[in-house]
């Protein structure tokens, strides 16, 4: 057989095979296709079968009706868990940026002397979500009603973490950022001229912010002994720069009684901004003549505010 005839036969064979496959796909109930005849030039012991009559054209399949999507079922909104009752004897403390949980040491000691069960959260400061998760882990370990306290950036954390938390009886903001719904730290800081401490913050190559050690005392902790501020600045924890632009999706102070300590000599958060936030949330305001690091410089006064808040909440239970 000539090469030309062989190529034509091969093409014809492939066309049959493709048509057979297409028929099987389009009409699964059709009879299996007959075995292909021997290619021309190939020996066969069986007599050549007569060519079958052409099959009638298949009727086009009726397209399946597209099911009408079921109407969504109305679901009742999940009711918030009932708040716990009883005396408030648990305190959870949430630190801010450029410090760690040890910044609460003096407050912890004072509250323990008053008989409270105190826990100090160690925030990773990697994002708002991470800090909220760390705080909620500590809250989950509390047995009974709890007062949640945040300093500085910790105010953003307790605003989110304290919402819909049945064991959180109330909130204390200590020179803290208190955002409203979908509001960020940066949104609030823009309400006043840049604070001196803001000019001392620098970013590293990984996107974390640090407070200049040489300005830590003057701009962050002016009423803390210098030897202690050197230790604090050496142990400072940086915060992710993106955290200051993250917004809250829940607002605890809208559903919980709140207190606010305004630090009148603050060089990190403007006292005017603190006063604005405290007034907006309807908090009970306690001014203290202090630098931003009031949990260190006035640990006793801060502990007294927390104690008074806990006692008042206990009377309301």
Predicted regions and their residues:
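N-terminal signal peptide c-region/cleavage motif recognized by signal peptidases
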Residues: 18-20
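Compositionally biased, proline/threonine/alanine/serine-rich low-complexity intrinsically disordered stretches
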Residues: 23-86, 315-317
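Conserved HGGG/HGGXW glycine-rich cap/lid loop of the alpha/beta-hydrolase fold
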Residues: 83-128, 167
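Gly/Ala-rich beta-loop-alpha elbow adjacent to hydrolase catalytic centers
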Residues: 149-154, 158
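Active-site nucleophile elbow and catalytic-triad environment of alpha/beta-hydrolase enzymes
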Residues: 231-252
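Short beta-strand/loop motif that positions the catalytic acidic residue
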Residues: 260-262
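Conserved loop-alpha-helix segment in the C-terminal half of the alpha/beta-hydrolase fold
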Residues: 264-296, 308-309
